[in-house]
Amino acid sequence: MKQAIVARADIGMGEGKLAAQVAHASLSAYEDAGPKPRKAWKGAGQKKVVLKATSESELFELADVAEREGLPHAVVRDAGHTQLDPGTVTALAVGPAEDELVDRVTGDLPLF
């Protein structure tokens, strides 16, 4: 079981902003999962990986694949209180789900 969080590398988020957006995505996708995958993921150590995307359109393409695969996922839009304009799409989380299912969506992306 794992979760992949894909963050945009093209919008110049500071380290703190990046950490917050990754956390928002992780929690939102966790909430999108059913009780069985949530329990299994928590019991297996809550494995996560943070990956890079190069554009908003890439995040939406990945989200579409996750949707078609029936995987829990969440797209994060920033509130715009600090570094980014309101509504800026910053991250996508896929999972928690079986590793191979998450890899169908995010397996070709580089580490952040």
From Swiss-Prot:
Give the signal peptide as a residue range, or say none if absent. none
Name the Gene3D superfamilies for this protein.
Bit1
The EC number(s) this enzyme carries: 3.1.1.29
Q: List, alphabetically, the Pfam families matched.
A: PTH2
Q: Which GO terms describe its cellular component?
A: cytosol
Task: Tell whether Protease is among the UniProt keywords.
Answer: no
Provide a Gene Ontology MF annotation, just one.
peptidyl-tRNA hydrolase activity
Cell location: Cytoplasm
Give the record's GO biological process terms. translation
Listed A to Z, the keywords are: Cytoplasm, Hydrolase
Domain of life of the organism encoding this protein:
Archaea
Catalyzed reaction equations: an N-acyl-L-alpha-aminoacyl-tRNA + H2O = an N-acyl-L-amino acid + a tRNA + H(+)
Matches recorded under PANTHER family: PEPTIDYL-TRNA HYDROLASE 2, PEPTIDYL-TRNA HYDROLASE 2, MITOCHONDRIAL
Q: What family is this protein classified in?
A: Belongs to the PTH2 family.
As for what it does, the entry says: The natural substrate for this enzyme may be peptidyl-tRNAs which drop off the ribosome during protein synthesis.
- What is the protein named? Peptidyl-tRNA hydrolase
Q: Which organism is it from?
A: Haloarcula marismortui (strain ATCC 43049 / DSM 3752 / JCM 8966 / VKM B-1809)
